[in-house]
């Protein structure tokens, strides 16, 4: 009869090979240990189904220990509905049962179900959670960015006696970080000193900083980790977060340190880490290094191609970006909506208007991507940069967008109006932004500048006073530059640093050499894209422009960085046209390559020209 039962079980061809093993081993040993062992080994649904049948036939359906292993096996196989059905049929589910299903919902991308299970765990037949339960529910809160629920569960944790568990505390740090509550995450992290921190807890805190635009703290904490007397080594997740922080800040030197650790740790073949490195080098202004990383990636994906296309686009290499896109499609890697955004961005920043319009028209038919407001906004930007402002304006009026995307749309049109001296377009775009309550400060400033260009200094000043009364404060312009292991930050007009005298003398000497070559400064360039909109004499305007933060950073770099090395400057705002023209000439005078990353793109100055070709 036993033989008949086994032979009547329907198995996939691969699992039928195991039947003789069951006849000899299982029925000989007659222990549930055999079942549990086989369940832990199972990687096949048919195999687990067979074991499930045997469990029922042999009377283990009411054995919590055995059924838990069945639940865990189904969870591993992504069969969460079957796992949940088994759980619901259990007579006495214990903490392992509950935690397994909660974890399963997390793995299937259903964090809301995981939290519902946790709530049910306390309501039906209260079962005290263990450290793995708490870690799983904090993971669910992280996925949903639910800080309110997370704090309530944190309160339960405090009275559970498990607060000092390193697994739970690490997941708690991660949860607060993903909920944008970095201060609370740091308090939890600091409290772990008393009972130990491991590479997971360090990674969680570094990632919290990196993901919340606090790259400086991420790098400093990474330095502390390296200095700590611990046997732990940075893993690929920590390194990816550090590399991301270096990308956002333009910290090339620390990015290279992280790259060295990636190599020593053997993570270069990890696609996520390699793509992070590619992105870091590109955003730090070292496109050649980014290209080397790209060429080393063995198995390319849409992510690696998209990152490289975006990098080339930001550096003004539109033709190269388009060529790479064609190579990707020829290699049968399907683009996604981000890839096509990158292609349109490349066309916009390189003056490839006809090509960009063609890609837009073919997106749905040829590439299977329906263009949305983000793609149309990119086309508005492209038309505006090329001087086809009226077409850009007409297109902008037809696009249906929400408030946030609308800010990007009208912000692009505002930039086009400023660039091409279209005061009426600047005025219209600014008013729409102010009405939408998005990018209000930049809109006020642009509208004020538009009044100033047309000679309406009183209207301009009145608008700036209104801006102050409404609490909108212009972000202070700053530039920073790396020298060895340090970063030097400069603000416009600020000469309070130790080298201020030397920098000021150097800039005046540069200004003299520029004028000898015909440079006439800001007084010859007063348009809506100029940078000085104050009713002062021309000499004072030139003085104000000469102390812009990017010029101060440039002077420092030329004075202190090794001769012949590339000067890399990061800027938190858009580079002004006056400085852009000056940098082109300076690159020729000093015979140095100068790379400036502003809020929109990279400008690579060399031999008197810029890679943007003035499409910016």
From Swiss-Prot:
Residues 485-515 are annotated as: Type E(+) motif. GO terms for molecular function: RNA binding; zinc ion binding. Gene3D superfamilies: Tetratricopeptide repeat domain. Keywords: Repeat. PROSITE patterns: PPR. Residues 409-484 are annotated as: Type E motif. PPR repeats lie at residues 63-93, 94-128, 130-164, 165-199, 200-228, 235-269, 270-300, 301-335, 336-371, 372-402. GO terms for biological process: RNA modification. Residues 522-616 are annotated as: Type DYW motif. InterPro entries: DYW_dom (IPR032867), E_motif (IPR046848), Pentatricopeptide_rpt (IPR002885), PPR_At4g14850-like_plant (IPR046960), TPR-like_helical_dom_sf (IPR011990). Pfam families: DYW_deaminase (PF14432), E_motif (PF20431), PPR (PF01535), PPR_2 (PF13041). Belongs to the PPR family. PCMP-H subfamily. NCBIfam families: PPR. This is Pentatricopeptide repeat-containing protein At4g15720. It comes from Arabidopsis thaliana (Mouse-ear cress).
């Amino acid at each position: 009869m036993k033989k008949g039962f086994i032979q009547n079980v329907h198995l996939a061809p691969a699992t039928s090979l195991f039947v003789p093993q069951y006849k000899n081993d299982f029925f000989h040993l007659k222990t549930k240990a055999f079942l549990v062992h086989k369940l832990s080994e199972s990687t096949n649904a048919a195999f687990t189904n067979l074991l499930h049948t045997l469990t029922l036939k042999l009377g283990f359906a009411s054995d919590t220990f055995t059924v838990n292993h069945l639940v865990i096996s189904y969870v591993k196989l992504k069969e969460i509905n079957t796992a949940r059905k088994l759980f619901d049929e259990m007579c006495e589910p214990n903490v392992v049962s509950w935690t397994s299903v909660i974890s399963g919902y997390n793995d299937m991308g259903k964090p809301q179900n995981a939290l519902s299970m946790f709530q049910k765990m306390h309501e039906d037949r209260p079962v005290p959670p263990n450290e793995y339960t708490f870690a799983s529910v904090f993971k669910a809160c992280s996925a949903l960015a639910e800080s309110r629920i997370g704090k309530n569960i944190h309160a339960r944790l405090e009275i559970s006696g498990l607060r000092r568990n390193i697994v739970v505390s690490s997941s708690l740090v991660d949860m607060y970080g993903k909920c944008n509550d970095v201060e609370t995450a740091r308090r939890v992290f600091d409290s772990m000193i008393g009972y130990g921190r491991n590479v997971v807890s360090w990674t969680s805190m570094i990632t919290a900083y990196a993901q919340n635009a606090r790259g400086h703290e991420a790098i400093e904490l990474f330095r502390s980790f390296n200095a700590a007397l611990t046997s732990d080594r940075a893993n690929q997740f920590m390194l990816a977060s550090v590399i991301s922080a270096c990308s956002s800040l333009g910290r090339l030197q620390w990015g290279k340190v992280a790259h060295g650790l990636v190599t020593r740790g053997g993570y270069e073949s990890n696609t996520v880490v390699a793509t992070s490195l590619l992105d870091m080098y590109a955003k730090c202004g070292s496109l050649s290094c980014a290209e080397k990383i790209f060429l080393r990636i063995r198995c390319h994906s849409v992510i690696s191609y998209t990152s490289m296309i975006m990098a080339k686009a930001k550096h003004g290499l539109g033709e190269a970006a388009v060529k790479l896109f064609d190579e990707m499609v020829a290699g049968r890697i399907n683009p996604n909506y981000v890839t096509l955004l990158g292609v349109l961005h490349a066309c916009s920043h390189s003056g490839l208007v006809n090509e960009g319009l063609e890609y837009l028209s073919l997106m749905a038919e040829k590439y299977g991507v329906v263009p949305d407001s983000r793609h149309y906004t990119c086309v508005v930007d492209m038309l505006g940069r090329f001087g086809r402002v009226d077409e850009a304006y007409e297109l902008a009026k037809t696009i249906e967008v929400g408030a946030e995307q609308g800010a990007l749309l009208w912000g692009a049109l505002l930039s086009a109006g400023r660039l091409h001296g279209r005061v009426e377009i600047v005025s219209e775009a600014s008013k729409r932004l102010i009405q939408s309550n998005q990018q209000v400060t930049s809109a006020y400033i642009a509208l004020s500048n538009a009044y100033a260009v047309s000679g309406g200094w009183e209207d301009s000043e009145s608008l700036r006073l209104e801006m102050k009364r409404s609490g909108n404060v212009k972000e202070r312009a700053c530039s920073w530059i790396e020298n060895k292991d340090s970063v030097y930050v400069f603000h416009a007009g600020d000469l309070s640093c130790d080298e201020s005298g030397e920098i000021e003398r150097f800039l005046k000497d540069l200004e003299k050499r520029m004028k000898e070559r015909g440079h006439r400064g800001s007084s010859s360039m007063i348009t809506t894209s100029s940078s000085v909109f104050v009713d002062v004499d021309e000499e004072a305007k030139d003085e104000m422009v000469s102390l812009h933060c990017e010029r101060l950073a440039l002077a420092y770099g030329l004075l202190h960085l090794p001769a012949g090395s590339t000067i890399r400057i990061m800027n938190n705002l858009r580079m002004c046209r006056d400085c852009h023209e000056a940098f082109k000439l300076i690159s020729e005078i000093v015979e140095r390559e100068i790379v400036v990353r502003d809020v929109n793109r990279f400008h690579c100055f060399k031999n008197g020209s810029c890679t943007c070709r003035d499409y910016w």
